[in-house]
Amino acid sequence: MGDSGGESSLGLIAGNGRFPFLLLDAARAQGLRVVVAAIKEETDEEMNERAHVDAGVTVHWMSLGELSRLIEMLQREGVTRAVMAGQVKHKQIFSSIRPDWRLAKLLLNLRTRNTDMLLGAVAKVLEDEGIALMSSTMFLEPMLAPVGAMTERGPDAAELADIAYGMKVARGIAGFDLGQTVVIAAGACVAVEAMEGTDATITRAGEIMRGLEQEASTLERRLTVVKVAKPKQDMRFDVPVVGAPTIEAMRAAGATCLCVEAGRTLVFDREAMVAAANAAGIAVVGEAAGG
């Protein structure tokens, strides 16, 4: 049923993971009615349970390529503001997607097929239809990473050197929309994120180090993970996120330090993440943007 008060409603285009649920809870705490566009290929079915127990939540399931259906649903529900939250696997976007006529036309007009170009074009279509796409950190500013160490220990001298190098490399690849994460060991770049995501990149770095010969036993314990926002990060989508699963991937890979960009990276379940990092002896630090 439509809501004539667009300002009292929020559309939530939900991908996978906890991000959509955290944003949903924050929006409901602000008294907003939330209309969820749940992606069949990505969104956790727990979203249905939220709608069952909360009359202020409405869930509509649709496939990733159904742009026209998304717009029609949001307009029917009286939504004039929407957010994107949660990851959508890059391989889903660029290989598994079955676009409707509207999305197919949009894809044909893209100069390059990267995430920024695609989501920016989708945002423009939504805006043209009277639906403003808002920052995905809306209501979640307290979860943005602070400057400085978040854990009991900060980075040591070797890790600080790897952070400085990793920041240069990570910002370079992020500028080309290739990924946001690099893994460094003793001044050498071990792994660079592409389509696989941060945790898979960390896992791959650990596998690479284990596959090396004599020096691996030393270097494996010195893996430093650096994750950054893009130089011109659009906070409406693809904002960097870390959490307890990131720390678990690091622990399994033998990584000892995580550096993220303060004020531009969301830290989910910070208390649990920091506790896990402290237990594993991993340093977690926020670096000032542009620092």
List where the protein language model places each region:
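Catalytic domains of riboflavin
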Residues: 13, 20-22, 43, 124-134, ...
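General beta-strand structural signal in soluble alpha/beta enzymes
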Residues: 12-14, 36-37, 82-85, 115, ...
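Feature captures the catalytic cores and cofactor-binding loops of soluble hydro-lyases/lyases
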Residues: 39-72, 76-79, 96-105, 200-291
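Flexible, glycine/proline-enriched loop segments at strand-loop-helix junctions
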Residues: 10, 58, 103-116, 149-159, ...
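Conserved mixed alpha/beta catalytic, RNA-binding, or beta-rich assembly cores of soluble enzyme
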Residues: 13, 17, 27, 132-247
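N-terminal basic/disordered segments at the start of proteins
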Residues: 3-39, 65
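Solvent-exposed alpha-helices and their adjacent loops that cap or buttress functional pockets
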Residues: 1-6, 51-52, 75-77, 125-126, ...
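N-terminal glycine-rich phosphate/adenylate-binding segment common to multiple enzyme folds
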Residues: 67-140
